[in-house]
Amino acid sequence: MKYKDLRDFLVQLEQRGDLKRVDIEVDPHLEMTEICDRLLKQAGPAVLFERPAGHTIPVLGNLFGTPERVALGMGQTSVSALREVGKLLAYLKEPDPPKGLRDAWEKLPVLKQVLNMAPKQLASAPCQEIIWEGADVDLGKLPIQTCWPGDVAPLITWGLTVTRGPHKSRQNLGIYRQQVIAPNKVIMRWLAHRGGALDYRDFCQIYPGQPYPVAVALGADPATILGAVTPVPDSLSEYQFAGLLRGAKTEVVKCLTHDLQVPASAEIVLEGYIHPDEMAVEGPYGDHTGYYNEQETFPVFTIERITMRRNPIYHSTYTGKPPDEPAILGVALNEVFVPLLQKQFTEITDFYLPPEGCSYRLAVVSMKKQYPGHAKRVMFGIWSFLRQFMYTKFIIVTDDDIDIRDWKEVVWAMTTRVDPVRDTLIVENTPIDYLDFASPVSGLGSKMGLDATNKWPGETTREWGCPIEMDAAVKTRIDHLWQQLPF
């Protein structure tokens, strides 16, 4: 699906019957979460709440509530087609040298397309049609959701945070939740390894005590949003990648407050600064684990201007016990990860992040085993390859005869090919999501790998079992007889 901006995307979804409008009053406090949660569990449509209680700005929910809509947002017609996106990223991450002149000519269009997708800066943009500044800056005018009964305050969930580090020419885009603590202040919850936090840390080291420019875009086009959660190579900006997905350059405009560039078609933009001496305790909030998280201290983002389109749309979501929207995103992005991993580890035949595993905490891998101990090499490789897998707690590795997307097959491999002492790998004192309260120390815990492959000589001294399989000729004969049998 090709589209210009979020509004164009919504028009096309509505034409497909994949967006429904709600014209009765619904409260952003809890009620929208309950409706979106039920819709998501039914693989239902995106929803536009046209009359949020106490507000005039409509709320968009459940936009990425099915893997198919994620694929459409990435410019593809099906979830399986996302493998092609992964192949492109794998090539851009580590391009192979051309094997000859013909191969070089065949690769030239791809490289040319990437170079041609540098963002296009506009002098003026729809996202700056309306400007709030000074005393007019009031987050209370926006229909920001409170998702769960125990949440401490309204929470911005789909904010596309724009930062730039002092050592980088390109900007970083990231999705970080933001707790509202005042009409012009939110808490910026970014974990230490995320791009925005790293940019901020580098800035503070070079310019100690100086305010750090930040912008948050709400209601950007889907390609730009999804570019921020995809493992884009460091040599490629998220804006460039969004252009590749969309098939057209990402249009940006300079903020009115500082020099950061934001998506020109964004519905709402928050502009301001983080002051290094201002921190606040964030949470508790219900999150993607299905629990309320611990409180933690993060920087405060002070908003100096809010700009927006005429008749803006506020894009929101909730996180909770899987499945939620992040889990659905994980299902779709899983198809992007497979070619990336296969480029680095050619023995991998499939890779699966079960949505019940809180998006990334459990991974199952199938492989063509080549030597004793091979499964452990794959485990360590996955943990260290992409930042997205830094917090993966459990990795199960099977042979390629197992359909790892069928849990019955995985359990069979685990119960018949695993000796707990020999085949369990425990790694202590590794980075863990601080939301994981099961770890003994916040942000630091252990990981476990389970080798559920057939064991080779050197891994066992016993004769290994041979799987039962019916004679092929008998199966063929019964296939022909089946329609004649009385069942």
Swiss-Prot record:
Enzyme active site: 287
EC assignment: 4.1.1.98
InterPro entries in alphabetical order: UbiD, UbiD-like_C, UbiD-like_N, UbiD_bacteria, UbiD_Rift_dom
Location relative to the cell: Cell membrane
Tagged with keyword Nuclease: no
Gene Ontology CC, one term: cytosol
Reaction(s) catalysed by this chain's protein: a 4-hydroxy-3-(all-trans-polyprenyl)benzoate + H(+) = a 2-(all-trans-polyprenyl)phenol + CO2
Residues noted as binding prenylated FMN in the record, renumbered to the chain: 175-177, 189-191, 194-195
Coiled coil segments of this chain: none
Entry membrane topology: Peripheral membrane protein
Cofactor(s) essential for the protein: prenylated FMN; Mn(2+)
Oligomer status and interactors: Homohexamer.
Name of protein: 3-octaprenyl-4-hydroxybenzoate carboxy-lyase
Species assigned in the record: Nitrosomonas europaea (strain ATCC 19718 / CIP 103999 / KCTC 2705 / NBRC 14298)
